[in-house]
Structure formats: structure tokens, C-alpha cells
UniProtKB/Swiss-Prot annotation:
GO-annotated molecular function: nucleotide binding; RNA binding; RNA-directed RNA polymerase activity
Annotated source species: Influenza A virus (strain A/Malaysia:Malaya/302/1954 H1N1)
Keywords recorded for this protein, A-Z: Eukaryotic host gene expression shutoff by virus, Eukaryotic host transcription shutoff by virus, Host cytoplasm, Host gene expression shutoff by virus, Host nucleus, Host-virus interaction, Inhibition of host RNA polymerase II by virus, Nucleotide-binding, Nucleotidyltransferase, Phosphoprotein, RNA-directed RNA polymerase, Transferase, Viral RNA replication, Viral transcription
GO biological process: DNA-templated transcription; symbiont-mediated suppression of host gene expression; symbiont-mediated suppression of host mRNA transcription via inhibition of RNA polymerase II activity; viral RNA genome replication; viral transcription
Residue ranges of the region described as Disordered: 50-82
Nuclear localization signal (motif): residue ranges: 187-195, 203-216
Entry protein name: RNA-directed RNA polymerase catalytic subunit
Length: 757
């Protein structure tokens, strides 16, 4: 029988059909090769948008810099970065007028955070440009290397463990005439393998000292390394993203803390909240505009798109904003916040790995490193690359390009949101002083603009005024990519609004399935994803039940753990059948041990071990939850773990799931091949560093309000904390006298060892 597909939708309101338009099935595209070309594109484009600015030279590094601020007002619709300082300051003043005390209060909140933040804050984050090795490293390693170099150069403030003291060292380092660093290099030797008697190449890692003069050090401190953004859907061309070094990171963190605090108080800001909270915030703004427009006015909404948001923003504007926001604050606070934008006005973009050349005739491949681009003969390149290189050459120093204008992706999301909201704020009738008025939503570079007016001409005038106001602040609304609708239908940050936000369930499809971490985590993540989608994404009970059955089936095929009484033969079926026969209470077996599935949509919130605990045979309980089981290398078990879940588009989301430690929570061992490379020492450093940080967290958990105060090393802080805690526990009778004495003895031993060292 042929089914007419439209029948499927008879009972469904039109807006719910959005899930059927899902385009993102296969894998997203990844980038290969170097990002050098994309980075050059970014640098050249950024300069083009500001080309009518003023050129100056950085006195320390000799880098040419372009300053478009207060440049000529645009005469056409082309994107441009000529923000006008007085307009930005005025927008800030009006924002403060509409929200009395907002800047003052946010400054006070931020000042407290600045004084309490520990330097280990900078270990969060993934790849970071490590200026000592001139390449990317995990954040913890990059920080450790930076601190090590600082100390060997006599910069010791960081020993207190406070981020603000580490930043004092950064400031001092920039005044030094030279910095001595330790770099790694590789030696290769051919040696005979004792076991196989074959010749193998052995790599050893060497360390050597190197001196950087002031200008070389400054270039490295101001460098952003660039990579290609991976897994971006819906684009033909890849684009470059930046990762800053440790000198910049801390300052950026404090600026963003202040901006986040401001965004939290602005009803038009889509940051820093997310999910349902964000939807509620946005629905409020829409409701306000629609309520007011019922009788006399008409209301339209623009789903907005800005052209090259980052490349037209300017750090000098951010400096002006910060100067205004902190104008009544203590000098030290104003200084520390103004450093990030100043560093960004002097930033250098590292061009990445360089170009790969192939000679088809001679079957040769060779890499031209970025450092050589400045003086290599251009006849080897094709036309488009040649043009790029010619354009960028005047800006090059040591394989990095001077990039004063523009902001690179993802650096000041919160602060740029404040700038965007300040324009939305100007739409109130008391500022437009006419019949039209506007409001809207802003989240980094994404915006939705709601305009109300008595007639269509008024709407058009309102949109024009908004467009021109944006131009004055260096924001370029794209007329081609923005579209306008009657209020009630628009899209904002991939949320689709139609008389309320529509659940776009299909976006979550890629996160259903077995994650492949381990049997325990996968089961937990799988049911949590289904539970979360029932809560947040209109996943109905029948569909959820079906999703659950499909998940269990998928899980059993992945781990080859079909029920013990099934006929399916796999590699594990012999053991699983044996276990099934020996088990009295078969309902107690975990699914991963061939047991039945007891999950249904009512009990998804309970970890499987807890769900079946009462049903388990005693000896099975003992085997399952045995921390001494020699075959299982355990992670330290927290009650809640984090999984990274990939929606179809948008950033990877962090999802919490309950973790119960069993012998199924195994951790795969590290690939051995890394242990034979130059990374080995780095890996060991990283593990040691991680252990120290974890230990420190044990003493000062982030939930604790007793932060270590004053200038002390991490060890001293932990010892004094151990003593205080031990005394409290002893006096309240939680620990015995012997334990107390033992703890005190250990503390004294540690101090003694430190003194001898």
C-alpha cells in the first residue's frame, strides 16, 4: 500500500516538522594539511576591512600595525572595522543609564574573583601555544613549562599559586632584556634491537638552553598559534582558529570574567547561560515586544547575521570599553584588565606549519616552513597563493604575521556580546525619540532584532537606523544573509522560535548510540542522553521507549554481550553462557554480563548497578564491586562524570552522567608508541602535574570556601590545611588519637624534607 507522506503530519503542528529537515547525516568534514593558507586569508581579510586606517610601527618588535579606530565613516555596505570611540563610549554610558550600577557591581564581583583565582585555572583548556617550545601542547604542560622558565629567570611571584601573582611575573618578563629558555630537540640513532636483532631508529630527546632577546621574547609572548577549525558543517571552505599562549590567557580570563558578570545582568544576552535557561530568557524578550505591539503597532523580527564579526572587532575598542566600565575602580584592577586588549592590539599570528610541496616527476615531498615564506621565490606558487604571500609579506617577522586589528575566533565572546547588547539597548523609545523602537537578543556574533512601529515605513526606518548604528561600532549586519519575518518566527543560535521555541530533536541524533568509553560509562551515558532528551527536547514516551530498545540492542552488539540464554554466537558467548548458568538470580546480571535489560522510561535516572543491586547473587556483587581486582585499572571515581556529547552542529556539549565504579569501568591503557618519542618526557611531566593538581584539589576542593590565603607554596598550603582539618576531626571525635598523631608526624616530616632540599 502506498502511503501519502503528508498524512503523517495531519495531527502535527507545522513547526514540529522541523526535525524531518535534518541534513546532517554522515561525518562532518575534517581538515588535512596545514592551516597556513587559511591563516593568511584571515590576516589579509582583516587588514582589508581596516585598510583606510593609520599605519604605525611597534617600537619594541618593529611590527607594522594598522589602526582603523576613528577611521573614515563607511560610504557603502562593504564590511569595515572603523569603530568610533566616542560612539562606543556613549553606547556604554546609555547601557549603564538603563541598568543603574551594573558596571560597578560587576567590577566588585570580579575583583573578588581576581584575588582568589589560583593559577591552576589556566590548566583547563585543550591545546595551548607553548612559547618555550614554539608549538602546541596540552594546557597543563604549557603552563608548567612557562612557570619553569620564569623561575629559572628569577621571576618568583608565581610561587604563591595565585593567578594574579603569575600575571605579575608575565608583566615583569616583558621588561627583561633577555629570557633564557630550555628547548627540546631530537637526536636519531640507528641501534640493533636486542630481541629481534634488527636495526631500529632510536629517538632521544635532548634539552638545550637558548637565549631570547627582548624583541624575540615579546613576539613569542604576543603570538597566537593558528589551526584549522575541524568538523564545521555547511561550509565549502575551512577557516582558521587561534590558540593563545600562557602570557595572554590569564589576562583574557579576567576580562571575560568581568564581561560574563555583566552579561548575566543583561536580559538581551544569550551568554553565559545555555539550554532551557537561555530559551526562557529569550522568550521573555519576545513576549515583551509582542505584548506591546498588539493593538496599534506591527512587529517584525530579523534573524540576523553579521559579516566577519571577529575580523571587524578591534581590541582598541575593547580597551575603551574596559576603561569606561572600570572608571571608578582601583588602579591595580584597571591596569590588570587593560592588559589583555593592549596585548591583542599588538598580537602576532603564527602562520602554522607552512606549505607542502610535491614534485610529481621526482616523487619528492618537502615542507616549506612558515619562516621561509618571507623570502622564498614566488615562482613555485600558484596565482592565488602568490597574491596572498605578496600581500602578507610586509607584515612578517620570524614566521609570524603582525595582526593588530581584528580579534581571532572565540577570544572575547562575552565582551563582544556586551558591545552588541549596548546597541540593542539604544532601541528604547526614549533613545530613538520617534515612533519606531527595537529590542533583541545577542550571543557573541549571532543576533535577533525585533522592531516595532506603527507601519511598514517605520519598520524600515528602524532597521536602517539599527544598521547604521552598528556600523559606527564596527559591527556589520549582513543585508544578504539576514532575513525579516513577522515576529513569532525566527532563528537564534540554532534555536527555532515559532510561537515558542521548537524542539529540534533531530539535532541530538548523533549523540544517541554507544560512546565507546567502557561498558559502565557507555550504559550510563546512553540512558542519560535519552533521559535528557525527554526533559529538554520533546522526546515522547513511545519514541523514548523505542530509542531505549535500539540502544540496548546496539550496546549488546558493540560489547558482544547478548543475553545468556540467547542462541547468538559471539566471541564472548562461551563465558557469558557459563556465567548465566552459574547465576541463581539471573535478573541481577548487568546487561554487559549477558543479563536482561531492566531499564524503562521510568527508571532511566538510576545507574544500572543500583537498579539491580538487590537482585544480584552475593558472590557476583563481590566480584563486580571489587576495587582490588587486578585486571581493572581504575580511574579515581567521582560520583558524577562528564562525557562529551556531539550534537549535529554547534559545539560539543558536556553532559554529566552518574558513574558507579565497578570492574566494568576499565580504562584503556595509553598507546605505547608515544613512550618511544620525544613526547615521553612531556607525558611524564603532564602526569606528574596532573597528580599534583588533583592532590591540591583534594585539600582545597573547588566547593570549599576556605581558600588558601597569603603567600605560600602549594605544599605549605596543603600541610597547613591538613593540620587544621586533622585538629578539627580529632576534637570532634571523627578520628582517633593515633591517627591524629600520625598525621602530625607526616606533616613535620614533609616540612623537614623541604628544609633539607
Amino acid at each position: 500500500m502506498d502511503v501519502n507522506p503528508t498524512l503523517l503530519f495531519l495531527k502535527v503542528p507545522a513547526q514540529n516538522a522541523i526535525s524531518t529537515t535534518f541534513p546532517y547525516t554522515g561525518d562532518p568534514p575534517y581538515s588535512h594539511g596545514t592551516g597556513t593558507g587559511y591563516t593568511m586569508d584571515t590576516v589579509n581579510r582583516t587588514h582589508q576591512y581596516s585598510e583606510r586606517g593609520r599605519w604605525t610601527k611597534n617600537t619594541e618588535t618593529g611590527a607594522p600595525q594598522l589602526n582603523p579606530i576613528d577611521g573614515p565613516l563607511p560610504e557603502d555596505n562593504e564590511p569595515s572595522g572603523y569603530a568610533q570611540t566616542d560612539c562606543v563610549l556613549e553606547a556604554m554610558a546609555f547601557l549603564e543609564e538603563s541598568h543603574p550600577g551594573i558596571f560597578e557591581n560587576s567590577c566588585i564581583e570580579t575583583m573578588e574573583i581576581v584575588q582568589q583565582t589560583r593559577v591552576d585555572k589556566l590548566t583547563q583548556g585543550r591545546q595551548t601555544y607553548d612559547w618555550t617550545l614554539n608549538r602546541n601542547q596540552p594546557a597543563a604542560t604549557a603552563l608548567a613549562n612557562t612557570i619553569e622558565v620564569f623561575r629559572s629567570n628569577g621571576l618568583m611571584a608565581n610561587e604563591s599559586g595565585r593567578l594574579i601573582d603569575f600575571l605579575k611575573d608575565v608583566m615583569e618578563s616583558m621588561d627583561k632584556e633577555e629570557m633564557e629558555i630550555t628547548t627540546h630537540f631530537q637526536r636519531k640513532r640507528r641501534v640493533r634491537d636486542n630481541v629481534t636483532k634488527k636495526m631500529v631508529t632510536q629517538r632521544t630527546i635532548g634539552k638545550k638552553k637558548q637565549r631570547l632577546n627582548k624583541s624575540s621574547y615579546l613576539i613569542r609572548a604576543l603570538t597566537l598559534n593558528t589551526m584549522t577549525k575541524d568538523a564545521e558543517r555547511g561550509k565549502l571552505k575551512r577557516r582558521a582558529i587561534a590558540t593563545p599562549g600562557m602570557q595572554i590567557r590569564g589576562f583574557v580570563y579576567f576580562v571575560e570574567t568581568l564581561a560574563r558578570s555583566i552579561c548575566e545582568k543583561l536580559e538581551q544576552s544569550g551568554l553565559p547561560v545555555g539550554g532551557n535557561e537561555k530559551k526562557a530568557k529569550l522568550a521573555n524578550v519576545v513576549r515583551k515586544m509582542m505584548t506591546n505591539s498588539q493593538d496599534t503597532e506591527i512587529s517584525f523580527t530579523i534573524t540576523g547575521d553579521n559579516t566577519k564579526w571577529n575580523e571587524n572587532q578591534n581590541p582598541r575598542m575593547f580597551l575603551a570599553m574596559i576603561t569606561y566600565i572600570t572608571r571608578n575602580q582601583p588602579e591595580w584592577f584597571r591596569n590588570i584588565l587593560s592588559i589583555a586588549p593592549i596585548m591583542f592590539s599588538n598580537k602576532m599570528a603564527r602562520l602554522g606549519k607552512g606549505y607542502m610541496f610535491e614534485s610529481k616527476s621526482m616523487k619528492l615531498r618537502t615542507q616549506i616552513p612558515a619562516e621561509m615564506i618571507a623570502n622564498i621565490d614566488l615562482k613555485y606558487f600558484n596565482d592565488s597563493t602568490r597574491k596572498k604571500i605578496e600581500k602578507i609579506r610586509p607584515l612578517l617577522i620570524d614566521g609570524t604575521a603582525s595582526l593588530s586589528p581584528g580579534m581571532m575566533m572565540g577570544m572575547f565572546n562575552m565582551l563582544s556580546t556586551v558591545l552588541g547588547v549596548s546597541i540593542l539597548n539604544l532601541g528604547q523609545k526614549r533613545y530613538t525619540k520617534t515612533t519606531y523602537w527595537w529590542d533583541g537578543l545577542q550571543s557573541s556574533d549571532d543576533f535577533a532584532l525585533i522592531v516595532n512601529a506603527p507601519n511598514h515605513a517605520g519598520i524600515q526606518a528602524g532597521v536602517d537606523r539599527f544598521y547604521r548604528t552598528c556600523k559606527l561600532l564596527g559591527i556589520n549586519m549582513s543585508k544578504k544573509k539576514s532575513y525579516i519575518n513577522r515576529t513569532g518566527t525566527f532563528e537564534f543560535t540554532s534555536f527555532f522560535y515559532r510561537y515558542g521555541f521548537v524542539a529540534n530533536f533531530s539535532m541530538e541524533l548523533p549523540s544517541f548510540g554507544v560512546s565507546g568509553i567502557n561498558e559502565s560509562a557507555d550504559m550510563s551515558i546512553g540512558v542519560t542522553v535519552i533521559k535528557n532528551n525527554m526533559i529538554n527536547n520533546d522526546l515522547g514516551p513511545a519514541t523514548a521507549q523505542m530509542a531505549l530498545q535500539l540502544f540496548i540492542k546496539d550496546y549488546r552488539y558493540t560489547y558482544r554481550c547478548h543475553r545468556g540464554d540467547t542462541q547468538i554466537q559471539t566471541r564472548r558467548s562461551f563465558e557469558i553462557n557459563k556465567l548465566w548458568e552459574q547465576t541463581r538470580s539471573k535478573a541481577g546480571l548487568l546487561v554487559s554480563d549477558g543479563g536482561p535489560n531492566l531499564y524503562n522510561i521510568r527508571n532511566l535516572h538510576i545507574p544500572e548497578v543500583c537498579l539491580k543491586w538487590e537482585l544480584m547473587d552475593e558472590d557476583y556483587q563481590g566480584r563486580l564491586c571489587n576495587p582490588l581486582n587486578p585486571f581493572v585499572s581504575h580511574k579515581e571515581i567521582e560520583s558524577v562524570n562528564n562525557a562529551v556529547v556531539m550534537p549535529a552542529h554547534g559545539p560539543a556539549k558536556n553532559m554529566e552522567y552518574d558513574a558507579v565504579a565497578t570492574t566494568h569501568s576499565w580504562v584503556p591503557k595509553r598507546n605505547r608508541s608515544i613512550l618511544n618519542t620525544s613526547q615521553r618526557g612531556i607525558l611524564e611531566d603532564e602526569q606528574m602535574y596532573q597528580r599534583c593538581c588533583n592532590l591540591f584539589e583534594k585539600f582545597f576542593p573547588s566547593s570549599s570556601y576556605r581558600r588558601p590565603v597569603g603567600i605560600s607554596s602549594m605544599v605549605e598550603a596543603m600541610v597547613s590545611r591538613a593540620r587544621i582539618d586533622a585538629r578539627i576531626d580529632f576534637e570532634s571525635g571523627r578520628i582517633k588519637k593515633e591517627d591524629f598523631t600520625e598525621i602530625m608526624k607526616i606533616c613535620s616530616t614533609i616540612e623537614e624534607l623541604r628544609r633539607q632540599k
